[in-house]
């Protein structure tokens, strides 16, 4: 019979500790929503915000397609403005890009794209949520996204392309979908508070 040495005990303890850590990690992963679930959660949060806004503004119908387009183009303009230090060659004294402000402007574009999806599309959003490549590796500037957005339409392929374009803008500036999701939740709370006040 093999003798149990101090080394055996130490190795066993190490393995036991590692196994415990792995079990903890697996449990954490099991409780973590998938990206598709996060996307559906964003749609739900946006739907609730839209209802608040529509009640407050006494709107009987959602905004028109053109109104959505104007709002999204305006938010892309604000996102691009946050990047002025990168493209404003005629002015020497530009503030450096503020990553937090940039993220908030990107989230604002997400708000209107989600709202459009809730109010102006006629397909299964679960299917859309499961079709989006959240680990999309392409990178897009706001202008490149705008070019994609010009094909913005009711169909699922176009909406999939729109959201993957937004993920691509996030990639360009170092924002993962997870980070966008967390920032979206925070901004959504602010938007709900505004909708309940006199904003």
Q: Which ranges hold each PLM region?
A:
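Flexible "arm" and connector segments at domain edges
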Residues: 3-199
